[in-house]
Amino acid sequence: MASEAPSPPSPSPPPPASPEPELAQLRRKVEKLERELRSCRRQVREVEKLLQHTERLYRNAESDNQELRTQVEELSKILHCGKNEDNPKSDVEVQTESQAPWAISDYYYQTCYNDDSLPSKETELCVQQSQCAQASALDPQDESHIDSGSYAGADATEGVSHRQEDAVTSDSQESVSALAEGPALEGSSLAESLRAAAEAAVSQTGFTYDESTGLYFDHSTGFYYDSENQLYYDPSTGIYYYCDVESGRYQFHSRVDLQPYQTSSTKPNRERRLKKRRKEPGFYTANEEKDLSSEDQKVCSVEYINCSEDEHSGNVKKKARTDTSHKSSPLQLTVAVSGDTVESPGDDNSASSKDERIGESESEPEEGEITDSQSEKSYDGDSSSGDRETSEESDDEDEERIWPPCIRVIVIRSPVLQMGSLFIITAVSPATIGREKDMEHTVRIPEVAVSKFHAEVYFDHDLQSYVLVDQGSQNGTIVNGKQILQPKTKCDPYVLEHGDEVKIGETVLSFHIHPGSETCDGCEPGQVRAHLRLDRKDEPLVGPALSKEEKELERRKALKKIRVKYGLQNTDYEAEKALKNPKYKDRAGKRREQVGSEGTFQRDDAPASVHSEITDSNKGRKMLEKMGWKRGEGLGKDGGGMKTPIQLQLRRTHAGLGTGKLSSIDDVHLIQNKSKKHWDKARERFAETFTENKPRKETPGAVPWVTGTAE
């Protein structure tokens, strides 16, 4: 039986695949995913930034839209108020203010116009007319003694003024009716037609147009309206007001100085009365009409030049007060103020000679007015002087209430401001004191010790004086050497007086309170700087030499000023402030402890000598050996140079060159100088004395010392 063929060997199983390629693929996938994740995060951040920017733009747009809505509402209200008014093109003389008519309760004139306390002005006007008619019927010769009325600005009128008013009113009504009926009026131009229409429209608002002056008179308030400047004029005080639409009140704008014309008899009385008032403690809080502050006059947008006494002295004698309030305008007006005749600045050529003759014949002269018939008529001096005094006192009180004084601030001492600088503070608006540049302070003091908004000065109408309020400053405020408050706390109002010195930081300010434009030598910049220059001249140019203690004192003072300048007066000097910081690491100290340092600065080699050989570590010897030199050979290329060292030669002290033979240091014995000899002798004497006194100390004190030897 044949043997079976051997079976082929079974194939071996394939070896398992190595995990390395799979791991590499996984790593690549992970890296790819990480890159994608980073890119996604970057995109998300960009989208978030874009979203924030869009939201910010949306908020800004919403705020702008809200502001526009409020503006549209305000404009719609204004349009609603003036939709019934017609504003045709007209001449400048008849332009009116496009505002709704104000009620009597809306007028405001220094707290004198109230809805409940004051009656209607038309009723007062009628009462004044009846009083004037009765007074003229009882005593026609004493017409000059009739008072102008309790209400200033509305004069008593007579028949002439009524006839003129009726004529003007009838003309305006006829012109309006003619315009309504036909296209044009015969014998009248287009300007006259427009003027008549404007007068008819204005008459409905309570204003009456005055053709001679081009102004409008309001019977309810007694004010004249200037359409060019949109101002209201009070003829009794010479004050101009503007109408505040938001509050519905008259606000002060400017004032015309009414220059009084007084007789020789009234001037001494007024001077005596002013002297008495100066002695009173509250006099400096009042302001006369002539004591206007120059700064207050600069605020006025419309300036009026007062007529001089020389220019109008002749006109005052000719003009008398007419009863028509329409022809007595604020620019050409003669009214009774404090019993004196006062004429406002204006154009004297506008009134005709015929009107002047009518005024002379049918009107009464003002009280205290200088007329041609004054020399012929005698007046009751006692009654007239009494009336004048009472009226002047009342007007003085009005002026005190209307015109508070101003403050002139002078820089007395300051490291940053020029000494003698002047700052003026008025009662119109509060004044601020601080360091910040962008806050537009009245008195800016660029010091470190001064806060950004340090203090505020304003006029308190209740106290009738200026007050200082510290706004919680860092270092506080000092007035006359006393600190009015603790730092960082807002203080109560501090009443300022004339001559107070206020210290803010290192700056000292002097406050001078004067009525009107009055000044003193202490608040005039020229006077102050002149005194400072004189003080500098008196100082010696070259001072005496300072001692060491005085120099140290000056150094300490200068150091203290530097600390105050940079705000370091409350901090102590620290020598090693950086080393005391816990975050500081002294790496140099650790390196010195661990590694150490070689003292290369300390020389440890022995000095050179001609008797000892140079060591192998000598750098000069090493250089010679590198160049081929060997021990025992001479210098040079062939070794034929010198072999012995250079000997040290000495010469005599203080001897010139070539005076003696140089000798070697080995052959010369150093001669001791005189001082060394003296020291040696002193040592010998000391040694002898010490050896002689030493046995004496050892012997007892009771036994006397005896020379000689004892047996």
From Swiss-Prot:
Its main location: cytoplasm. It comes from the Eukaryota. Residues 287-297, 374-391, 579-606, 613-623, 690-699 have a biased composition (Basic and acidic residues). One of its GO terms (molecular function) is nucleic acid binding. Residues 19-85 form a coiled coil. The modification N-acetylalanine is found at residue 2. GO terms for biological process: angiogenesis; cell adhesion; cell differentiation; positive regulation of angiogenesis; positive regulation of endothelial cell proliferation. Residues 1-19 have a biased composition (Pro residues). Residues 270-279 have a biased composition (Basic residues). It is found in: Cytoplasm; Secreted. Residues 167-176 have a biased composition (Polar residues). Keywords: Acetylation, Angiogenesis, Coiled coil, Cytoplasm, Developmental protein, Differentiation, Phosphoprotein, Secreted. One of its GO terms (cellular component) is perinuclear region of cytoplasm. Promotes angiogenesis and the proliferation of endothelial cells. Able to bind to endothelial cells and promote cell proliferation, suggesting that it may act in an autocrine fashion. Interacts with the secreted angiogenic factor TNFSF12. This is Angiogenic factor with G patch and FHA domains 1. It comes from Mus musculus. The lineage of its organism: Eukaryota, Metazoa, Chordata, Craniata, Vertebrata.
